[in-house]
Amino acid sequence: MSNLQEQLIALGGVFQAAVLVDRIARTGQASEANIGCMLGSLLVRDPKDTLEVFGGDDLNLRDGYRALIGALERDPNSLQREPLRYALSMLGLERQLNKRGDLLDTIGNRLPQIQSQAEHFGLVHENVIASSGALYQDTLSTLRQRIQVHGDMRFLQQPNNASKIRALLLAGIRAARLWRQLGGHRWQLVFSRRKLLNELYDMMRSPN
């Protein structure tokens, strides 16, 4: 797997989280499998490659890849505006987080507790989702930049949905951190658009 593919998998994770946030905000629905994959990505330690962070299967990131392709193609018909806004906001928040060692320490200290909960209850249990959402609230929500989520207030006001959205934003920012650690940079989205698209088209065509 090339470094560019690894970067695109991580960036696909950012966009996957963004798509799921948008879906929950607008419809109150997202599959447990998709949510579980993103929550699981928070807890993976020492993966053999980037894909293993997301369950070892590109299919888990298909919706994220599609949203990323839509953003890079700049086609108004395929552009998913809210997921793109969330994804770019997560990339920005990750850069702020990187300057805050205290918040990184808090996240590092509390993830093992969430891991224990997940082992006991299961990844998508409401306790695990609530703990992950609370970790986002106690750390990333304290930064100057905030992510404003737009959607149907009937769904946004439900505590479980709010926790899911925060937990997914935390997972998306973890993916953004991974992307940057792999050498990803926002300028690539502007100046290497065609190269990224060609690689993404190949990844979408491949069986895995």
Curated annotation (Swiss-Prot):
Subcellular location(s): the record lists:
Cytoplasm; Cell inner membrane
| UniProt keyword annotations, A-Z | Cell inner membrane, Cell membrane, Cytoplasm, Membrane
SUPFAM superfamilies from the UniProt entry: YcfC-like (SSF101322)
User: What Pfam families does UniProt report for this protein, alphabetically?
Assistant: DUF489 (PF04356)
The principal location of this protein is cytoplasm
The organism's superkingdom is given as: Bacteria
Alphabetical list of InterPro entries matching this protein: HflD (IPR007451), HflD-like_sf (IPR035932)
Coiled-coil annotated residue ranges, if any: none
Cell membrane among keywords: yes
This protein is called what?
A: High frequency lysogenization protein HflD homolog
Q: Which organism is it from?
A: Pseudomonas putida (strain ATCC 47054 / DSM 6125 / CFBP 8728 / NCIMB 11950 / KT2440)
